[in-house]
Amino acid sequence: MIEIQSPKPFTFADDPLIFLAGSIEMGLAEKWQDRVVKALADESCTILNPRRDDFDPAAKQEASNPYFAEQVNWELDALDFADIILFYFDPNTKAPITLMELGLHAETGQRILVCCPEGFWRRGNVEIVCARYGITMVNTLEELISKAKWLI
C-alpha cells in the first residue's frame, strides 16, 4: 500500500486508487483515515488521503486563497481519478463537503462504499441516496474496511 496525502501529486497506478472521503472536522471527527490506512497496509493499493499534515485551520476558505484552492482542487481530482471511494460520515460531525461529494459521485459508476453510523444527522438522506444508486452502505468503520479489502 502506498499513501499519498494532499497536496502531493498522484497519477494512475496499476493498483487501485482509493480516495478517503469523509468527516475531517478538526476537534470533532475521529482520525478515521489513520485506521483505514493501517488496516489496508498489506493491500495492493494507493490511498489518496485528503487529511494533510500541514493543515492550517486558520486559512480562509475562499477560492482566492491559493492554499485553500490547492486543497479543494486536489480533492476534486482525487475523487475523479479514484477507482474506489470510501465515504465515512462521523456521527459527531455535519460533514457538508462529504455529503456534497457523495452527491457528485453517486451516479458515476465508480466503486463506492459508504459508512454512515446511527446518529449521523442526515443518515436518512445518505440511506436514500445509497439505495437509489445501488451503493453499499454499512454501519461501522470495521465493515467499511472489510468490504474495501474485498473490492481491492
Where are these regions (language model features)?
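Conserved catalytic or regulatory cores that recognize and/or transform ribose-phosphate-containing ligands
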Residues: 1-152
